[in-house]
């Protein structure tokens, strides 16, 4: 049974047991999901015949944080290798709510803790995504950000 985090009622955590562990690149007995979205994607990747291999938070992409100027590690949600006709294609996929794909609306009169948190997260996420795009370009991969709309939610 997934554990529920009451700070965010939409957050769940648990272990995913793949039906096809040979497809998982990493330790298939140690696959952790941190949301129901991740669990849904894991199940889909595991069952999809066109998915040759996949992993969850196994890749490390260094990025420079705009908040402190230091290099940090970014662990994208998924890496996927897919058969597309005679060729294979690799993707790095991040799951995010659609509202996190646009910058926070500036309101100089209201600089609440929540607003400042959103600004920091927006800056941090953009740095991660820029690093992921550069990484993917070098490795002939594609970086995708999936939202609830992409997942049919």
Task: Briefly describe each language-model feature range.
Residues 1-153:
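Electrostatic, structured charged patches in enzyme active sites and in nucleic-acid/phosphate-binding
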